């Protein structure tokens, strides 16, 4: 019996020692010396002390981060408490602070070592230490949020304030020293000894591997299958989503309270609409039972890959102390003060004023607003270097609005076809149900290439890696969040399957099969047909749209079905295989599965808008043959040049028409000559624009 207790104490000691070693390695490898100094000052200047242990509680954390909480100076910011995310964030950090020993140490007291691990994990700096660890935090984040199927979290956190102090090795009041471990979350207690290790947390394995401590992981961190049985309550996820949406534009060292306080009722209503839309994507059963790991993992990995990005600038606040004065003179050995070395100021450096992401000057949007933009930033990437829209300082330029420019394809082509950069198409309209009730819906598409009638793309071998910023995306953001990611092999599709297609006869088609135009094709044979995981068709009057979503694959196509991400498919030739589930979307254009269930929405268009994407100045460069950067010409300047060219061509056509003669037959002959030359008519958009 004594031997067993000794072995248990040794194992506990090993776990504590390894946890501290990992925190030390994170501190030295993932932070600069200056950042670590600021982190220490922020932590210890606010820390509470008990039995010689310095730690933070929920109120201190919420107050420092500026997160609305149920108590303290960061108390409820909204009357309904939807932004009271303090308890949610504190639960997360109490779990993450125990990494990689969540089974036996979580929830942990938020000591300085625990805070180091929290900041590293939530700002994704762990890649500097965990070289072989996959940058995939989904399981870790799920475990930190799961609160259904666990022992009462509030009671457990209170117990942890005492039990974990003793587990660190502090002598108890009755004498002696003990390593009485906190029991950990109930769902995290190790069971299922004989299970495969394929489901082990990749980050935890990499952390233990970096410390040469895999055996400790196998003994003390056996994979716990009950983590897949626990769930996140709807209230917890709703509060987190609300916080993430309102703080999505937060920049490093930005003021959090700017986004979490003073929100108008209309702004909060819009936030709640987007939160409800995301929750609706999980299904109706979530409201009763909570969010399971499978649903959570699929939602994040396939349609919200950048959802947790706002946590990075939020926790980077810990790496700058407003109290720290590094310019103080230091005394030398002879008592003389040295000249102060140039050091960073004790207040955040003033950066040049940033223009808003949504640029003004073209039209007042009826669809796009800061809340919608936050939602879009969770799944649209505009740069392979810095995916997040707010982090890479992308700007959105107003290109076309049906309200401002009219419901005309001529106007659409004038504004959109001349925009030589990626665009985001947004449509707001109504879907009429069977009982004649109208449901407002908002759909859209991300088009990474310039629009043109005859689609041609730069050649790319299918074996080359792709980034989401280079792939198109079809989506619905209200009333049910739905994202159809672009297929990694879309550039190798046939020429009759472009990402976007424009025709004055049939309208606008996105992700459709375009029938060949011939004299024999009549009527419906000329209309584009849905393909792949989904398609969007807009009539030539810009009055009606058809949004088609397939549960399977309507043959090969531009878009994957919902619930499938480009990284979750393997590309071989023209076939795409879905790896996450047993439902394979492998199909060819000639063998469309009749069992595929298509959902078709017929939408009466209220507003249609196109927004042009302008990358930041630092990202809008490319290298020449010598490696020197070459500035790309601004998309706005290119469009204006195209408009000037079209104006000159219009004047030239008018002069030619006048020379042809005033007779009707002569005018028709002149027009025919101009059409044959490609100067007027539909064919003018087939050629590449002149510069």
UniProtKB/Swiss-Prot annotation:
Domain of life the protein comes from: Eukaryota
Region of interest (Disordered), ranges: 329-355, 559-595
Cellular location(s): Cytoplasm
Cellular component aspect of the GO annotation: cytoplasm
Positions with biased composition (Pro residues): 341-355
Keywords, sorted A to Z: Cytoplasm
Domain TLDc: 366-614
InterPro entries for the chain: TLDc_dom
Ranges of Low complexity composition bias in the record: 561-595
Family label: Belongs to the RTC5 family.
Purpose of the protein: May be involved in a process influencing telomere capping.
Protein known as: Restriction of telomere capping protein 5
Natural source organism: Blastomyces gilchristii (strain SLH14081)
Gene responsible for this protein: RTC5
């Amino acid at each position: 019996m004594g031997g067993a207790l000794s072995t248990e104490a040794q194992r506990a000691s090993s776990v504590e020692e390894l946890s501290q070693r990992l925190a030390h390695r994170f501190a030295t490898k993932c932070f600069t010396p200056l950042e670590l100094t600021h982190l220490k000052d922020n932590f210890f200047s606010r820390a509470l002390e008990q039995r010689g242990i310095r730690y933070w509680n929920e109120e201190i954390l919420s107050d420092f981060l500026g997160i609305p909480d149920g108590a303290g100076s960061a108390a409820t910011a909204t009357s309904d408490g939807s932004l009271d995310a303090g308890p949610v964030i504190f639960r997360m950090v109490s779990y993450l602070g125990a990494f990689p020993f969540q089974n036996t140490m979580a929830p942990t007291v938020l000591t300085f070592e625990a805070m180091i691990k929290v900041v590293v994990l939530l700002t994704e700096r762990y890649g500097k230490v965990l070289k072989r660890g996959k940058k995939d935090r989904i399981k870790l984040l799920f475990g930190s949020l799961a609160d259904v199927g666990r022992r009462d979290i509030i009671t457990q956190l209170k117990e942890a304030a005492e039990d974990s102090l003793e587990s660190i090795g502090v002598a108890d009041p009755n004498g002696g020293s003990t390593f009485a471990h906190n029991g950990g979350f109930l769902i995290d207690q190790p069971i299922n000894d004989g299970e495969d290790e394929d489901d082990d947390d990749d980050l935890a394995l990499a952390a233990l591997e970096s410390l040469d401590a895999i055996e400790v992981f196998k003994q003390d961190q056996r994979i716990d299958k009950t983590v897949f049985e626990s769930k996140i309550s709807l209230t917890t996820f709703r509060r987190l989503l609300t916080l993430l949406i309102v703080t999505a534009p937060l920049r490093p060292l930005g003021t959090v309270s700017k986004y979490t306080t003073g929100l108008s009722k209309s702004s909060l209503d819009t936030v709640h609409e987007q939160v409800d839309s995301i929750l609706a994507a999980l299904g109706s059963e979530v409201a009763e039972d909570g969010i399971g790991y499978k649903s959570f993992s699929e939602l994040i990995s396939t349609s919200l890959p950048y959802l947790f990005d706002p946590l990075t600038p939020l926790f980077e606040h810990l790496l700058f102390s407003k109290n720290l004065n590094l310019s103080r003179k230091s005394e030398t050995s002879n008592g003389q003060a040295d000249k102060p070395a140039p050091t960073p100021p004790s207040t955040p450096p003033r950066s040049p004023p940033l223009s808003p992401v949504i640029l003004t000057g073209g039209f007042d949007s009826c669809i796009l607003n800061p809340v919608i933009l936050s939602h879009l930033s969770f799944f649209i990437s505009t740069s392979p270097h810095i995916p997040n829209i707010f982090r890479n300082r992308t700007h959105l330029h107003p290109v076309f609005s049906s309200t401002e420019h009219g419901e005309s394809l001529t106007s659409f082509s004038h504004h959109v076809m001349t925009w030589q950069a990626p665009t985001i198409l947004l449509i707001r309209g109504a879907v009429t149900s069977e009982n004649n009730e109208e449901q407002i819906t908002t759909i859209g598409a991300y088009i990474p290439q310039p629009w043109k009638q005859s689609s041609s793309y730069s050649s790319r071998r299918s074996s080359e890696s792709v980034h989401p910023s280079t792939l198109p995306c079809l989506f619905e953001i209200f009333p049910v969040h739905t994202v159809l990611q672009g297929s990694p092999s879309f550039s190798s599709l046939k020429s009759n399957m472009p990402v976007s297609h424009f025709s004055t006869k049939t309208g606008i088609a996105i992700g459709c099969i375009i029938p060949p135009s011939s004299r024999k094709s009549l009527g419906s044979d000329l209309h584009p047909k849905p393909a792949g995981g989904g398609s969007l068709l807009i009539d030539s009057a810009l009055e009606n749209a058809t949004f088609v979503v397939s549960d399977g694959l309507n043959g090969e196509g531009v878009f994957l079905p919902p619930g499938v991400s480009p990284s979750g498919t393997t590309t071989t030739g023209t076939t795409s295989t879905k790896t996450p589930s047993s439902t394979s979307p492998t199909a060819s254009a000639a063998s469309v599965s009749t069992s595929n269930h298509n959902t078709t929405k017929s939408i009466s268009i209220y507003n249609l808008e196109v927004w042009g994407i302008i990358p930041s100045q630092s990202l809008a460069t490319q290298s020449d043959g010598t490696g020197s950067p070459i500035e790309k010409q601004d998309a706005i300047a290119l469009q204006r040049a195209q408009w000037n060219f079209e104006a000159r061509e219009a004047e030239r056509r008018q002069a030619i028409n006048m020379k042809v003669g005033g007779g009707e037959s002569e005018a028709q002959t002149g027009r025919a000559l101009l059409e044959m030359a490609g100067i007027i008519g539909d064919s003018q958009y087939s050629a590449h624009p002149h510069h």
